[in-house]
């Protein structure tokens, strides 16, 4: 069932103008296309929210709608709801201003700049480079505005008003009895076009320049972290210096070590006699070999912590831990002599077959007793 305008804005039919404005603001923000890119359902709801506000914010149209519904509005000047002369971007801007970052506001802010001033790149480093830090050469390219056309892309340095949108950067598209606003395809939302392209930059407004830096990567950096280098990114016509370069770090995996935050994890094979006797074993850490004293009768998959053998925290300098999980190994093949030795060991513990059976039977009786009450 189709919702009425009051239901779309989630207000009652007796709501005053201030309530309608607040409801519109809330719903427009919620369903704005810039916040829900690629979401067709949100896009349709945003159109309905604007449609509802256009009617309910106008006393005359609201009165007609309350009496006759949508049918009563069809005969109004400018088509249904009078949207023929209304710019939804202007409605939105009247609430949120030109600095809010949505719709036509964004277009005005970016007008004249063909690219952002800051630059983001990604670089890979090895596991050990991340753990201990390193100095690394980073190659990249940045954009520098064309000096011939001052970044405009036009031969004479001037841009012409787009004839399709009249310089607004957006056009109205009619769908049935409604008109909605979308970015102008002809000028890509800029409101301006280039008639004669600059021969130096071929209309791009910039040139790509290769550059490199020697980057000091700090000890303990982790995958996903970014480093900023000032004044090494793109150059804009109206700026005295270049933007900031942001370098996202991707750390490659290691064959032996697994890292989680500042801790290192490894699985260490331990022979069953070492676990039974509580031997001291050697463990390879990121900082060299360390001794690990096993308790007598250590269990398979038991974990042990070697403090201060992990990664240095990039913020406070504290060292993490090295977590060792042991994996008890048994021999696959035994000689006759080894079998006899194990049998002798078994007998030395007094593990006769009859005693083992009695112990199992006793356990079985205990379990049965749980269900007898």
From Swiss-Prot:
One of its GO terms (molecular function) is zinc ion binding. Residues 4-69 form the J domain. InterPro entries: DnaJ (IPR012724), DnaJ_C (IPR002939), DnaJ_domain (IPR001623), DnaJ_domain_CS (IPR018253), HSP40/DnaJ_pept-bd (IPR008971), HSP_DnaJ_Cys-rich_dom (IPR001305), HSP_DnaJ_Cys-rich_dom_sf (IPR036410), J_dom_sf (IPR036869). It comes from the Bacteria. Zn(2+) 2 binds at residues 162, 165, 184, 187. Binds 2 Zn(2+) ions per monomer. Signal peptide: none annotated. Keywords: Chaperone, Cytoplasm, DNA replication, Metal-binding, Repeat, Stress response, Zinc, Zinc-finger. GO terms for cellular component: cytoplasm. A zinc finger (CR-type) spans 133-210. SUPFAM superfamilies: Chaperone J-domain, DnaJ/Hsp40 cysteine-rich domain, HSP40/DnaJ peptide-binding domain. Its cofactor is Zn(2+). Coiled coil: none annotated. Zn(2+) 1 binds at residues 146, 149, 198, 201. CXXCXGXG motif repeats lie at residues 146-153, 162-169, 184-191, 198-205. GO terms for biological process: chaperone cofactor-dependent protein refolding; DNA replication; protein refolding; response to heat. Its main location: cytoplasm. Gene3D superfamilies: DnaJ domain, Heat shock protein DnaJ, cysteine-rich domain, Urease metallochaperone UreE, N-terminal domain. It holds the Pfam family DnaJ. It is found in: Cytoplasm. PANTHER family: CHAPERONE PROTEIN DNAJ, DNAJ HOMOLOG 1, MITOCHONDRIAL-RELATED. Homodimer. The J domain is necessary and sufficient to stimulate DnaK ATPase activity. Zinc center 1 plays an important role in the autonomous, DnaK-independent chaperone activity of DnaJ. Zinc center 2 is essential for interaction with DnaK and for DnaJ activity. Participates actively in the response to hyperosmotic and heat shock by preventing the aggregation of stress-denatured proteins and by disaggregating proteins, also in an autonomous, DnaK-independent fashion. Unfolded proteins bind initially to DnaJ; upon interaction with the DnaJ-bound protein, DnaK hydrolyzes its bound ATP, resulting in the formation of a stable complex. GrpE releases ADP from DnaK; ATP binding to DnaK triggers the release of the substrate protein, thus completing the reaction cycle. This is Chaperone protein DnaJ. It comes from Campylobacter lari (strain RM2100 / D67 / ATCC BAA-1060). The gene is dnaJ.
């Amino acid at each position: 069932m189709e919702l009425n305008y009051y239901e779309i804005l989630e207000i009652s039919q007796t709501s005053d103008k201030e309530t309608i404005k607040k409801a519109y603001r809330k719903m427009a923000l919620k369903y704005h296309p810039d916040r829900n890119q690629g979401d067709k359902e949100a896009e349709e709801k945003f159109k309905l929210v604007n449609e509802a506000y256009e009617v309910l914010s106008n006393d005359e149209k609201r009165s007609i709608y309350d009496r006759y519904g949508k049918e009563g509005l069809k005969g109004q000047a400018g088509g249904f709801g009078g949207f023929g002369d209304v710019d939804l971007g202007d409605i939105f801007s009247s609430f949120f201003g030109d600095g809010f970052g949505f719709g036509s506001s964004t277009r005005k802010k970016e007008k004249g700049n063909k690219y952002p001033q800051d630059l983001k790149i990604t670089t890979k480093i090895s596991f050990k480079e991340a753990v201990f830090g390193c100095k690394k050469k980073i190659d990249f390219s940045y954009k520098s505005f064309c000096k011939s056309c001052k970044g405009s892309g036009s031969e004479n340095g001037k841009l012409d008003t787009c004839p399709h949108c009249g310089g607004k950067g957006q056009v109205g598209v009619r769908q049935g009895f409604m008109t909605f606003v979308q970015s102008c395809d002809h000028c890509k939302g800029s409101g301006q076009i280039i008639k004669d392209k600059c021969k130096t930059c071929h209309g791009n407004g910039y040139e790509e320049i290769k550059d490199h830096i020697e980057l000091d990567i700090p000890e303990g950096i982790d995958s996903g972290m970014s480093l900023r280098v000032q004044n090494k990114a793109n150059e804009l016509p109206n700026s005295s210096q270049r933007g900031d370069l942001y370098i996202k770090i991707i750390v490659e995996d290691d064959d032996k070590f697994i890292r989680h935050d500042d801790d290192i994890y490894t699985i260490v094979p331990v022979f069953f006699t070492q676990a039974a006797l509580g031997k001291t074993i050697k463990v390879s850490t990121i900082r060299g070999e360390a001794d690990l004293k096993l308790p007598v009768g250590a269990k398979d998959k038991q974990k042990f912590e070697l403090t201060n053998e992990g990664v240095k925290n990039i913020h406070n300098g504290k060292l993490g831990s090295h977590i060792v999980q042991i994996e008890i190994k048994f021999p696959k093949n035994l000689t006759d002599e080894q079998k006899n030795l194990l049998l002798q060991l078994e007998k030395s513990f007094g593990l006769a077959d009859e005693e083992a059976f009695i112990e199992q039977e006793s356990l079985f009786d205990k379990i049965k007793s749980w269900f007898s009450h």
